[in-house]
Amino acid sequence: MDSTRLPVIFLMGPTASGKTDLAMRLREHLPVELISVDSTLVYRGMDIGTAKPSPEELAAAPHRLIDIRDPAEPYSVADFLVDAEREISAIHRQGNIPLLVGGTMLYFRALLDGLAQMPAADTSVRAQIEADAAQFGWPYVHQQLAEVDPDVAADIHPNHSQRVSRALEVYRVSGKTMTQLRREQQASGDVRAFEDRYCVRQIAISPRDRAILHQRIEQRFHAMLAQGLVEEVRRLYQRGDLHTDLPAIRAVGYRQVWDYLDDKLHYDEMVARGIIATRQLAKRQFTWLRGWMTNEGARSTSENSQLHWLYTETEQGKPLAKEEIVRCALNFLKPTAI
């Protein structure tokens, strides 16, 4: 380990890949404390549909940045950066290693690249974007964004109108994408790279075969329904102060159940769309991870900036025991803890 930089571990992966289970098992072997990197786990009262660790699991392996917002409250990338930097520093002061675990790739990327200063809002540009959306739909506007800034577009659902609009607005106002602005400000020294301050070990856990993940996603969504997902969303629905323009309610699974409660979907259609939306989320997460090493290689040749893939099956497709997955992770991470 580089003695001039304190260690930090990233544990990333698509939804339903086993990230949380691995993180809690690693805690039994390494002096780590867990920080959640998930844009939905921040919300209180949203437990089943987010696959939030149970109270018993959280008591055994506490996660920071879980249950820190009401669903009516916004939570931005900038909020996450402030919270994550604070928790990382606190864990280091205690002599432990921060292990950041989750699937919100935009948060991980923002940590590595820093949060660049973006141009101020332009009402005329935003009005034109909204006019295009009204005429052609938000998926059309999202495609326009993907053509100029595929990295940012990959993490934004086409129906997430506010984020799509803002990202495209930044490009039209400045002539540069959000991705370009972040990289330029980092190169100029305006944003000090995360890896300049920390010794980072990055792991991505995933099945080798996408079909295996799709099967897990379907099984997990049915399990969530059996555990009371509809009732959980109903409690949110009946509050009266929540609506589908809020990021919390647009979360995968929640939006589909909300539409079911709003009589916009039949039950079977809600189930099918919930599974499809979750698979689409996993696809976006894979898109980020596939480009991760390319992006890292362009920025740094440091061993500590490289992504280590950890597959949950052998090359022959045989599932690895959980103990074997932990052993593989420890083989990569042990130098971090020395």
Swiss-Prot record:
- EC number(s) reported in the record: 2.5.1.75
One GO BP annotation is: tRNA modification
- List the Gene3D superfamilies: 1.10.20.140, P-loop containing nucleotide triphosphate hydrolases
Give TM regions.
none
The UniProt record gives the binding positions of ATP as G13, P14, T15, A16, S17, G18, K19, T20
Q: Which cofactor does it need?
A: Mg(2+)
Q: Which InterPro entries match?
A: Dimethylallyltransferase (IPR039657), IPT (IPR018022), P-loop_NTPase (IPR027417)
Q: Name one GO molecular function term.
A: tRNA dimethylallyltransferase activity
- Per UniProt, the enzyme's principal EC class comes to transferase
Keywords in UniProt for this one?
ATP-binding, Magnesium, Nucleotide-binding, Transferase, tRNA processing
- Positions bound to substrate: T15, A16, S17, G18, K19, T20
According to UniProt, residues marked as the site described as Interaction with substrate tRNA are T104, R126
* Protein origin, superkingdom: Bacteria
Which reactions appear under catalytic activity for this entry? adenosine(37) in tRNA + dimethylallyl diphosphate = N(6)-dimethylallyladenosine(37) in tRNA + diphosphate
Map out region (Interaction with substrate tRNA) in residue numbers: 38-41, 162-166
Q: Which Pfam families match?
A: IPPT
> Subunit notes for this chain?
Monomer.
Record family assignment: Belongs to the IPP transferase family.
What does this gene product do?
A: Catalyzes the transfer of a dimethylallyl group onto the adenine at position 37 in tRNAs that read codons beginning with uridine, leading to the formation of N6-(dimethylallyl)adenosine (i(6)A).
The protein's matches in NCBIfam families, at most eight in alphabetical order, are given as: miaA
Protein name as catalogued = tRNA dimethylallyltransferase
